[in-house]
């Protein structure tokens, strides 16, 4: 009979099975064969489990090393990245003005730095009457918030992310009112978005009154031909329609801005010294406008000076006359109807008496 004998030897981290074959001269050995077969099966299963454990350990090690490598790469990339530039927090210490005036001024300064982080602004030089660039820090030096405030009257777009505002000094009360109106509009917008109040569509009474006034702007540097043709036509046309006309005359730099009316009404008067030629030019503009509207307007009302700016307020001549003519005609027709009715009554009475 052939008898299978197994020798087993354990090596570190693995099993090695040595199979030894030999001849056995004894009788049947079924029980020994079954026992040896179980040993073989158990050894094979143990080897399989150990192999899986080794493979799993290598995968975990690779995953861990990969994670550490990814973390190190992320740290390295974050280290190489430049930190984002934080917006500058500008703090201006005002030595004058009320708390409300300081809030209004800081609100304007904050708006300027949102337009460009360097704080670059434009201003009109009172001596040369030309637009110059400066910094808001320099512009606000020495101003008294008890008397004046800041106002953005126009904005020049430089590129997608940068714009330069045109800044002027206005009266303190004007700056405070504008700031209060802005805060009120912002609060109203928030309440509308929350659904607390509804947006009003009705026009106010002052808006209706303002609709009867037409506003035109003219620069002191206007050419005589443009004044006598284009502007003269605009003024006369509105007067013929029965509108009041306000003519705003200022320097070319100011009148060309987007918010020219706001700039005109709220800027602080700045008298400049005129040359002889400039004085003659400005006198010509005022005299020519008065000459153009002489036939269509009552006596013009002039407000301002040649050295700074001026408003010429015009009212149509025929407006009052037309109203009086219509009223007189209405009364005349009413009187005629009464007279005709009276005659009919008298005739009727006469016929009745005759019968």
UniProtKB/Swiss-Prot annotation:
List locations, semicolon-separated. Mitochondrion
Bias type Basic residues, positions: 78-88
Which residue windows does the record flag with biased composition (Basic and acidic residues)? Answer: 336-349
Residues covered by region (Disordered): 55-88, 322-355
- Tell me the keywords, alphabetical order: Mitochondrion, Transit peptide
* Transit peptide extent on chain: 1-30
Database matches in Pfam families:
mIF3
Q: What is its main location?
A: mitochondrion
**Origin: domain of life:** Eukaryota
Provide GO CC annotations from the record.
mitochondrion
Polar residues bias spans: 61-77
Quick check: keyword Endoplasmic reticulum in the entry?
Answer: no
Keyword Mitochondrion carried by entry: yes
The record's similarity note reads: Belongs to the AIM23 family.
Q: What is this protein called?
A: Altered inheritance of mitochondria protein 23, mitochondrial
Gene source species: Zygosaccharomyces rouxii (strain ATCC 2623 / CBS 732 / NBRC 1130 / NCYC 568 / NRRL Y-229)
């Amino acid at each position: 009979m052939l008898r299978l004998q197994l020798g087993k030897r354990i090596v570190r981290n693995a099993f090695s099975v040595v199979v030894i074959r030999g001849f056995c001269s004894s009788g049947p050995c079924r029980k020994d064969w079954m026992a040896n077969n179980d040993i073989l099966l158990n050894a094979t299963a143990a080897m399989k489990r150990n192999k899986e454990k080794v493979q799993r350990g290598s995968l975990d090690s690779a995953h861990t090393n990969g994670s550490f490598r990814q973390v190190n790469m992320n740290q390295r990339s974050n280290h190489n990245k430049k930190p984002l530039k934080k917006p500058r927090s500008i703090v201006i210490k005002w030595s004058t003005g009320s708390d409300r005036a300081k809030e209004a001024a800081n609100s304007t300064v904050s708006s300027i730095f949102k337009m460009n982080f360097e704080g670059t602004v434009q201003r009109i030089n009172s001596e040369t009457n030309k637009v110059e660039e400066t910094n808001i820090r320099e512009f606000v030096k020495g101003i008294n918030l008890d008397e004046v405030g800041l106002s953005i009257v126009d904005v020049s777009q430089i590129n997608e992310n940068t714009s330069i505002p045109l800044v002027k000094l206005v009266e303190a009360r004007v700056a405070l009112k504008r700031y209060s109106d802005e805060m009120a509009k912002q609060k109203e917008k928030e309440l509308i978005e929350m659904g607390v109040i509804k947006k009003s569509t009705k026009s106010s009474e002052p808006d209706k009154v303002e609709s009867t006034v037409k506003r035109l702007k003219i620069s002191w540097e206007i050419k005589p031909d443009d004044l006598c043709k284009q502007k003269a036509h605009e003024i006369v046309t509105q007067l013929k329609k029965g509108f009041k006309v306000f003519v705003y005359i200022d320097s070319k730099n100011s009148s060309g801005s987007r918010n020219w009316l706001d700039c005109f009404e709220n800027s602080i008067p700045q008298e400049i010294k005129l040359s002889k030629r400039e004085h003659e030019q400005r006198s010509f503009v005022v005299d020519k406008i008065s000459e153009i509207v002489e036939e269509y307007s009552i006596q013009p009302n002039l407000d301002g000076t040649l050295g700074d700016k001026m408003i010429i307020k015009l009212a149509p001549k025929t407006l009052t006359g037309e109203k009086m003519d219509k009223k007189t005609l209405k009364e005349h027709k009413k009187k005629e109807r009464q007279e005709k009715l009276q005659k009919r009554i008298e005739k009727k009475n006469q016929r009745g008496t005759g019968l």
